[in-house]
């Protein structure tokens, strides 16, 4: 079954990431110094059809943040919807990180996207490897730091102004790239098994529908 295998691979991957991060002997820097720009997205008014009809701009929601790389999404908005909201276009090879309600979902963009509120777009500086940043933000170290700054309210939120102050061990870019290679094989296996599981669920749903036609 794919689910236990996915869980096992995820556990091993987490252990590798944590070992690599905890073994770093390097200077610390504030998280805010690692990116060129960062910010939450926003949702265009849903009652205005001109913000959505025939839209071509990918609009990412929390359900899209399920794998290491964002390769597809379900929803789109128009250029007008982008202009009339607080959404902004997050470039390719950036990080998306959910910081509201469901906190901690993360992916790397493979094409420009905008997001709803509660999802941060993070554009790394040139001296920061996006693969390393992905794994660092997936580490127990970072998750614990996030848990300490989450505010309770109508919705749990980790605000960017607080995330920016998290101290991060940041080695040279060459070392970052070396660390990022360590869990990559397991990550590929996880993504593959998740794709198979998704296909299986779709086939099952199709067969169930056919039974009642």
Predicted regions and their residues:
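Low-complexity, Lys/Gly-biased intrinsically disordered segments
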Residues: 27-67, 83-86, 152
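Extended amphipathic alpha-helical segments enriched in small hydrophobics
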Residues: 172-200
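Face-specific signal for non-transmembrane alpha helices
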Residues: 7, 14, 184, 191, ...
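Glycine- and charge-enriched low-complexity intrinsically disordered segments
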Residues: 134-143, 151-152
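Non-catalytic DNA-recognition/assembly elements of restriction-modification systems
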Residues: 5-42, 67, 165, 169-173, ...
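A short glycine-rich beta-alpha junction/loop motif
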Residues: 52-53, 99, 113-120, 128-131, ...
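Hydrophobic structural patches
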Residues: 6, 17-21, 179-187, 212
């Amino acid at each position: 079954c794919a689910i236990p295998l996915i869980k096992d691979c995820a556990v091993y991957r987490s252990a590798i990431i944590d070992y690599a991060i905890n073994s770093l002997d390097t200077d610390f820097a504030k998280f805010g110094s690692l990116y060129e720009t960062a910010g939450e997205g926003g949702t265009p008014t849903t009652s205005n059809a001109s913000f959505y009809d025939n839209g071509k701009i990918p609009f990412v929601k929390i359900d899209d943040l399920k794998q290491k790389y964002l390769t597809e999404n379900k929803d789109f908005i128009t250029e007008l919807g982008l202009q009339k909201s607080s959404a902004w276009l997050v470039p390719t090879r950036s990080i998306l990180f959910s910081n509201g309600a469901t906190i901690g979902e993360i992916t790397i963009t493979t094409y420009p996207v905008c997001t709803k509120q509660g999802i941060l777009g993070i554009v790394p500086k040139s001296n920061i490897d996006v693969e390393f940043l992905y794994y660092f933000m997936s580490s127990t170290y970072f998750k614990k730091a996030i848990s300490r700054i989450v505010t309770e309210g109508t919705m749990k939120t980790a605000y960017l102004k607080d995330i920016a102050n998290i101290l991060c061990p940041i080695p040279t870019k060459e070392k970052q790239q070396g660390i990022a290679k360590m869990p990559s094989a397991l990550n590929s296996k996880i993504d593959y098994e998740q794709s198979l599981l998704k296909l299986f669920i779709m086939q099952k749903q199709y067969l169930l529908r056919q039974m009642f036609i």
